[in-house]
Amino acid sequence: MAENNFPPLPRFIPLKPCFYQDFNEIPDQHRTMCKRLYYLWILNSATLAVNLIGCLAWMCGGGGATNFGMAILWLILFTPCSYVCWFRPIYKAFKSDSSFNFMAFFFVFMAQVVISIIQTVGIPGWGVCGWLATITFFSTNIGSAVVMLIPTIMFTAVAVLSFIALTKVHNFYRGSGGSMSKAQEEWTSGAWKNPHVQQAAQQAAMGAAQGAMQGQQYSAAPTYNYDDPM
């Protein structure tokens, strides 16, 4: 079994990586989408970090410490939770063509989209520099509001990209014949947690794709029949 390599922690930290991540084990036809979702997770995490700075400016401008404290919780909790709860399921889904993991991704990522929209709105007291909080604070402190505007724009980008990603993955899943009943069958049989079954499904999918490509390659080649003269 491969050694865990994510997150890549410095050697002086007395902790070891918790997950194994290698995009080369994702089938070619899914690798680009999987990487884009990973970059979306990075953008979401970076947005939460920038939001912490925005809430610090908010507090320094007279906005109170509640938002800054909530921003710390957003960053500490949602950065690892979003990776574990929606990126890992879609990573496994693309890797082994698992309907159960696709359903887990859809369930959590829909909540992620809703949260991103709430963050974009920016309700005061929630620890996020959204549009409502930023625009109203311009009348109090323009300098702080300008700093708050940066995470506001980033939250908007995350919300839009998350909705687009959810739509694309859903269209792909339904187009490939996936359904809730298939996910229930995997849950009942326990195939979703069996690495041997997952590996076999992955190999079968890759073999089918290679066979289709070879069939297209040789379908145009002429065939000759020879009669035995003996």
Swiss-Prot record:
Q: Which residue stretches are annotated as topological domain Extracellular?
A: 58-64, 123-145
Q: Which residues lie on this side of the membrane: Cytoplasmic?
A: 1-36, 86-99, 167-230
Q: Which residues cross the membrane?
A: 37-57, 65-85, 100-122, 146-166
Q: Which GO terms describe its biological process?
A: exocytosis; positive regulation of calcium ion-dependent exocytosis; positive regulation of cytokine production; protein transport
Taxonomic placement: Eukaryota, Metazoa, Chordata, Craniata, Vertebrata
Q: Which PANTHER family match?
A: SECRETORY CARRIER-ASSOCIATED MEMBRANE PROTEIN 5 (PTHR10687:SF5), SECRETORY CARRIER-ASSOCIATED MEMBRANE PROTEIN SCAMP (PTHR10687)
Q: Which domain of life is it from?
A: Eukaryota
In this UniProt entry, which cysteines form S-S bonds? none
Localization, per the record, is: Cell membrane; Golgi apparatus membrane; Golgi apparatus, trans-Golgi network membrane; Recycling endosome membrane
Give the keywords, sorted.
Cell membrane, Cytoplasmic vesicle, Endosome, Exocytosis, Golgi apparatus, Membrane, Protein transport, Synapse, Transmembrane, Transmembrane helix, Transport
The UniProt entry lists membrane topology as: Multi-pass membrane protein
Its source organism is Danio rerio
What's the protein called, per UniProt? Secretory carrier-associated membrane protein 5
Q: Which family does it belong to?
A: Belongs to the SCAMP family. SCAMP5 subfamily.
Function, as annotated, reads: Required for the calcium-dependent exocytosis of signal sequence-containing cytokines. Probably acts in cooperation with the SNARE machinery.
| One CC-aspect GO term | Golgi membrane
Keyword Transmembrane part of the UniProt annotation:
yes
Where does this chain mainly localize? Answer: membrane
